[in-house]
């Protein structure tokens, strides 16, 4: 089954809603954003969650030491590096975060524009992180745009990335289009924020459940094809 993360969790009700819907992980944004959550709030939410649920903190251009302190203080099981953290720093992040999941976000448009030299920096460091997440950031906004990137254009690139890393697809996913994303990319995971909200950081119960159901159905369909 495709791993499913509901990102931008800001309150316990939404966390329980996503957990009950069948999400595998929740995301907590600590970088400046309309969906930002304070560490104290996130820690209280995480303390109330089942242990099997992933708790992923989203950070931007924080040092390995700062990220490690955040993970320890809040109780995170993983970190999503959403900024410009270079490939040659991945070893330092891994050393600072033993036993925790590390996801490195790359912006799809940047990947397409920069080409293989840009990707090779992360390919050479792939042993130090657990997944590449492809997102559709915009100028001044590193995620949560609600706009998908060009799936057809980047599909061949995703196939190459999958040769050396687990891949998570994000960026403009909704209950209506996530099945198509699963069919096109056959990713290890998918990640959604604005596509299941009725306002920034406020989850819509029916949309969350519909999203998780759509992922499950699409994953089962892909399994039958294999």
Question: What is each PLM-predicted segment?
Answer:
Residues 1-5:
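Extreme N-terminal starter segment of soluble prokaryotic enzymes
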Residues 75-76, 187-190:
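Proline-aspartate-enriched helix->loop->beta-strand connector
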Residues 17-20, 44, 69-73, 92, ...:
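Well-formed, non-transmembrane alpha-helical positions, independent of function
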Residues 25, 30-34, 41, 48-168:
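Conserved anion-binding
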Residues 40-49, 91-93, 193-226:
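C-terminal helical cap(s) of enzyme catalytic domains, especially alpha/beta-barrels
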Residues 160, 168-183, 197:
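A C-terminal functional module that forms or caps the active site or interfaces directly
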Residues 18, 79, 132, 150, ...:
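Conserved, mostly hydrophobic/aromatic
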């Amino acid at each position: 089954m495709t791993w499913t993360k509901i990102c931008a969790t800001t309150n316990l009700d939404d966390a329980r809603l996503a957990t009950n819907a069948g999400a595998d992980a929740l995301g907590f944004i600590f970088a400046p954003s309309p969906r930002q959550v304070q560490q104290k709030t996130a820690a209280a939410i995480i303390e109330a969650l089942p242990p099997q649920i992933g708790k992923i903190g989203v950070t931007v251009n924080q040092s390995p030491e700062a990220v490690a302190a955040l993970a320890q203080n809040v109780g995170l099981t993983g970190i999503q590096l959403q900024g410009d953290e270079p490939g040659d720093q991945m070893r330092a992040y891994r050393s600072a975060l033993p036993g925790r999941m590390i996801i490195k976000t790359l912006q799809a448009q940047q990947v397409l524009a920069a080409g293989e030299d840009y990707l090779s920096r992360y390919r050479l460091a792939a042993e130090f992180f657990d997944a590449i997440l492809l997102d559709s950031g915009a100028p001044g906004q590193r995620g949560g745009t609600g706009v998908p990137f060009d799936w057809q254009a980047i599909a061949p690139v995703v196939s190459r990335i999958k040769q050396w890393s687990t891949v998570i697809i994000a960026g403009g996913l909704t209950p209506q289009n996530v099945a198509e994303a699963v069919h096109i990319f056959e990713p290890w995971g998918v990640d959604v924020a604005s596509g299941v909200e009725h306002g920034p950081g406020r989850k819509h119960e029916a949309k969350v459940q519909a999203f998780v159901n759509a992922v499950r159905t699409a994953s089962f369909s892909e399994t039958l094809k294999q």
